[in-house]
A protein has these predicted regions:
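Conserved catalytic motifs of ABC-family nucleotide-binding domains
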Residues: 237
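Serine-dependent protease modules
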Residues: 1-209, 213-216, 221-225, 232, ...
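Conserved "HGTGT" condensation-loop signature of ketosynthase/thiolase-family condensing enzymes
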Residues: 240
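Short strand-turn-strand beta-turns centered on an Asx-Gly dipeptide
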Residues: 243-248, 274
């Protein structure tokens, strides 16, 4: 991708600035996935295919909370990538494809170092595949594929741009990216479940005092008015132990479990209130858009 910025300072002196990124052809009718940060703020986006053809791309929608964007081009005879049917596992060989530093399409090889990485502070929702395949500026938004060329993830970030973080790169899982793709095509935005609470993790001594095995448990600190949690009868001070039978160990996991729900889905909450176990049934709402 090339994204162009038209900046005027002073008004009579216009300068055009461009940057590069990569993307993945997801459908045969021209829908493309890339990173939100690759196209954020762009006045025009041009996509170049491997065969050398170029086309202006239309931005269909973005999801800043997970750093994905959907583009659309109008070209014939385009081949979408195939999705991997295997769950990503530590030790799997993967290939990162992109356009590092604008030098042209390149492939780097690595292995999956970890899965379900979260708590990195990169995105609101994190469930990264960690790999040691070389990722550089220009690779963002490109595919991470298995040895058969099937999509495993969307390359998104490196931990740091210093030599101390070499070999630590992150990709958004293909299953997550495909869900966002479908949401944006249908709704123009990502659709996620929402309860409407703020919570903090129980300290180990507090968890033990309540008979929980640390780090299990989140204590509710605030409930949004007229939210699903409000209507379900949750109260500040309630300790959420499980959500739909998933043990709650931290805010990141709880957010991911709720966000993966569709609005209208039932939510079974196992909570502690005043030292007594209680089951509360709620109905997931729609997560508000973050500006």
């Amino acid at each position: 991708f090339k994204k162009f910025y038209d900046r005027s300072n002073p008004p009579k002196q216009q300068r055009m600035r461009s940057s590069l990124g990569s993307g993945v052809m997801m459908t045969d009718d021209g829908y493309v996935l890339t990173n939100h940060h690759v196209v954020d703020g762009a006045d025009a986006i041009v996509l170049q295919l491997q065969d050398g053809r170029e086309a202006a791309a239309t931005l269909i929608g973005t999801d800043p909370e997970i750093d994905l964007a959907v583009l659309k081009i109008n070209l014939e005879n385009i081949s979408p990538i195939q999705l991997s049917t295997q769950k990503a596992k530590v030790g799997d060989v993967v290939l990162a494809i992109g356009n590092p530093f604008g030098v042209g399409q390149s492939v780097s090889q690595g292995i999956i170092s970890a899965t379900q990485r979260k708590g990195l502070g990169l995105n609101t929702f994190e469930n990264f595949i960690q790999t040691d395949a070389a990722i550089n500026p220009g690779n963002s938004g490109g595919p991470l594929v298995d040895s058969a060329g099937n999509l495993v993830g969307i390359n998104s970030a490196i931990l740091d741009r210093t030599s101390y973080a070499m070999g630590i790169s992150f990709a958004i899982p293909a299953s997550t990216a495909v869900k966002v793709l479908k949401d944006i095509i249908i709704h123009g935005k990502a659709i996620r479940g929402w309860l409407g609470v703020n919570a903090s993790q129980l300290r180990p001594h507090a968890a033990k005092k309540l008979g929980l095995d640390p780090p299990l448990g989140l204590v509710i600190t605030n409930i949004y008015e007229a939210s699903p949690a409000f209507f379900a009868g949750l109260l500040p001070g309630d300790v959420i132990v499980r959500i739909n039978n998933n043990g709650v160990i931290d805010n990141d996991k709880a957010m991911n479990v709720i966000a993966d729900l569709s609005p209208g889905d039932s939510v079974k909450l196992d909570v502690l209130r005043n030292g007594k176990r209680k089951i509360i049934d709620a109905v997931a709402g729609t997560r508000p858009e973050i500006n």
